[in-house]
Amino acid sequence: MDLVIDQANIHSFLSSSESEKRDECTRLIKNGINVIFNFDKSDVNVSSEDGQKLLMWLRLFTQGLKTHAPQWGKRVDTASIKTNFPTTLSAKGKRDIYLLNNKEVIEKIKDKGAILIGSLGDEIALLSSLILENTEVPAISIQSWSDYIPDIPVTDIIICDNHYFKNKYVFEANEHELVKALCKMPNQSPVNCIIISKKGEVDRELDITSELQKLKKIIKEITGSTKSTVTFMLTYRTHDRNTVTNYFRLKCGSCYHLKDNNLKPDVTAEIKTHANITNGEISNYLLSQYQQIIDNNKNDIVGDKKSNFLIFPD
């Protein structure tokens, strides 16, 4: 995960009166986020107070750094950035963080809820949204996924749950509550939703094609985007229950259906933010496993077959 940040945003971050939160955000970055200074090193006015603060922070920041050394050079042309910026990004770019100094345009992009992006003054709040500690809780204590899922932008949702379609009664009682909770941020911005489940574990009374269309309608209504897509994949290659999104992974010890599902007391759920290197690597590994399912199991895939993180055959 990269953080692309303008010089003005660094000065704003360092000038924040919330020193404790600023220190927490600095630790967050050091533990797993690659920093891309969206300007040349020669652009820093070393004779100014702000320039001195930046260089001093940089020296302290690089001590004990767990990621690559910060990189310099313009990655994003902030002055000419447009509101369609999220759609122009690569798959990796859709999982990065952006702090850029163009408030008018950035606010419009931020409102779309597709990527983590902020303008001048947003630095602490945006980075703090990825400080997700002590999130492991008993699944039975979660009243609804909407209360538990953090408010983080998303373009893609990949749910792997062997028993998602196993019981028609349980399936209908839960009404795709997890998907709805994950789609709460996008606003007029499409979401690609993929559900991977176990072949042979689908209730015979469920019509998969019909259920796909129902879910697609739900996601389009929530996101406000007619370009939202849904894909169902069935496989005998089982995996742990994980949900991978742009910025975090949701791990659960049992089926994601919370209602009427006889959850055991020792079943837990936990959010693993990609701001942590290990968590990001595990999500990448899972994506590689899901890609193998697509490559080896083309006949058991229905729907739009669209994703920013997985590649479907033409």
Where are the regions that the model predicts?
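PLD/PLD-like phosphodiesterase catalytic module centered on the HKD motif
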Residues: 1-146, 175-314
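Secondary-structure "cap/kink" motif recognition
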Residues: 150-156
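Structural motif
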Residues: 156-158, 248
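Short glycine-centered, acidic/aromatic-flanked micro-motifs in structured strand/loop junctions
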Residues: 159-162, 197
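Domain-level signal for Mg2+-assisted phosphodiester chemistry and nucleotide/NA-binding surfaces
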Residues: 162-179
